[in-house]
Amino acid sequence: LTLLALVAGAALLGYIISLFGGIVTILITAILLAQKSLVQHVQQVADALRISLDEGRQKVAMIVGRDTGHMDQPAVARGAIESAAENLSDGVIAPAFWFLVGGLPGLMVYKIVNTADSMIGYKTEQHADFGWASARFDDLLNLIPARITAALIALPAGVHSQWRNIIADAKLHRSPNAGWPEAAMARAIDIALSGPRAYEGQMQDFPFVHPAGNQFAGPSDIDAACSMLWKAWGIALLFTTILTIL
């Protein structure tokens, strides 16, 4: 009966969405595809870690920018989970938010700025000014979505009562935005995120986010993070659909 209810609900939702034109269908489809791709890439790290540490390192190297060659298992797992939380924010929630705020123009502006920040950022001296500007604009555009993402993670996890702790944890992060979804995810599955890591051969001693959490993360914690991604996405999709129709 539950399955039938879910199928019927999905069919009804699909019918309602179809009544409101192709653009809404395209938006919902894009959100679904982005979420599915994100979960698949993160889940692949867990699956690889179950085979060997080297396999896990190779998979996590595809979704993080830090050095992965000397990572231990907890570092690999943390990297995957941090990427999951951050990309839920800037790859799924933020595009939907800016579409709701500004329609297609809002969405396009966000995607262009986010892509510019990802591709250029501070990577070359030649484009330093453009990189700085795109990074700052990207920070501005993700200010609200990052905090919404944190709430979307905290709510189904039942850790919304720890919101003050999430705020405090978010401030430990070097990014003004990435710390929010990461802090919420850390509390949701009770593990410590961030912490020391290497970039271009240089170790950087970043503080842990939710330092009281488990510091020995593994494949099962990545599984838990993927489950949280789907729960947060489900709530986001519901609100996006309702607000788009209204």
Task: Put a short name on every predicted segment.
Residues 112, 116, 120:
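Active-site His/Glu-centered metal-binding helix of metallohydrolases
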